[in-house]
Amino acid sequence: DRVYVHPFYL
């Protein structure tokens, strides 16, 4: 699981 996901992560 990701702790942080970038808002513009593709």
UniProtKB/Swiss-Prot annotation:
GO process terms (BP): vasoconstriction
Keywords from the named record: Vasoactive, Vasoconstrictor
Domain of life, per lineage: Eukaryota
Family, as annotated: Belongs to the serpin family.
Official protein name in the record: Angiotensin-like peptide 1
Organism: Bothrops jararaca
